[in-house]
Design a protein with these regions (language model features):
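Short beta-strand His + acidic residue motifs that chelate non-heme Fe in jelly-roll/DSBH
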Residues: 56-57, 73, 79-84, 89-91
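Double-stranded beta-helix
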Residues: 2, 84-108
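A cytosolic small-molecule/anion-sensing beta-strand core signal
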Residues: 50-51, 67, 85
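Short acidic-glycine-tyrosine-enriched beta hairpin
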Residues: 59-76
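Histidine-centered active-site/metal-ligand motif
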Residues: 38-40, 79
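Short, conserved beta-strand element in jelly-roll/cupin
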Residues: 41-56
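A short glycine-rich, His/Asp/Glu-containing loop-to-beta-strand
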Residues: 3-37
Length: 108
């Protein structure tokens, strides 16, 4: 049995296996405001709110996340997540997701 945890800020990949990884996302500057969007060119990305509150933005829509529901952002869609200070979000994506296959746009 392997057990992983993360109680830091921002995002951390806590476990990887073959072609996928699980990360934990917590409050940090990057996730405190809706000031950018990103899209992954090689993977879908799934989010599960475990604690706190979060808003998931996808192109021209926003979703107030509900705990323990899976929100899957399809490959290539622009998105961003904003979380409360007490939030914890589980993130699942391909293990090779990186800056090389992700595009990011910032708003002025």
């Amino acid at each position: 049995m392997e057990i992983y945890e993360y109680d830091g800020k921002d995002f951390c990949a806590v476990m990887q296996y073959e072609g996928w990884k699980i990360g934990m996302l917590r409050y940090g500057d990057r996730f405190s405001t809706y000031n950018c969007v990103e899209r992954h060119l090689a993977t879908d990305e799934a989010f599960v709110l475990l604690a706190g509150s979060a808003t998931l933005y996808e192109e021209d829509q926003s979703f107030e996340m509900e705990k323990c529901k899976v929100y899957n952002v399809k490959r290539g869609l622009w998105h961003h997540i904003v979380v409360s200070r007490d939030a914890t979000v589980l993130v699942i994506e391909n293990s090779d997701t990186s800056k090389e296959n992700t595009e990011r746009k910032y708003f002025l």
